[in-house]
Amino acid sequence: MSRHRRPQGFNRTDRVADQIQRELSRLLQFEMKDPRVNLATIQDVTVSRDLSYAEVYFTLLGQGEEAGAEAEEVLTKASGFLRSSLAQGLNTRTTPKLRFHYDMTPERAAHLSQLIDEARAEDRELRPEDDETGNNE
């Protein structure tokens, strides 16, 4: 006999992660009074299969790596408050322990874009004839 398998996609852990992301975003915006996390945006949440842990990835609007590390520390210290607030809205027996991670993807992307722009500018300086002929390969 073959087992019935659920289709790949939006399973229970995905639904719980989505709910945690929405609720944490609301909590950070309206419940947290610390200015170091006011500009935090929850980018992604992944939940372990047994729902015991939630990895929470966040960014800070217009802030650097140092501010991100500080915000990560603040959120880690506030994880008990955040977890108990989450427990009221989640329909699970237990509420996952929250682990916060500062997501440096936007800063890295901006840096890479800047490097590409600089390389293009240097290339144009070294080979200006390509710009005139429209042959930019």
UniProtKB/Swiss-Prot annotation:
The keyword Cytoplasm applies. Residues 128-137 have a biased composition (Acidic residues). Residues 117-127 have a biased composition (Basic and acidic residues). Keywords: Cytoplasm, Ribosome biogenesis. Pfam families: RBFA. Monomer. Binds 30S ribosomal subunits, but not 50S ribosomal subunits or 70S ribosomes. This is Ribosome-binding factor A. It comes from Alcanivorax borkumensis (strain ATCC 700651 / DSM 11573 / NCIMB 13689 / SK2).
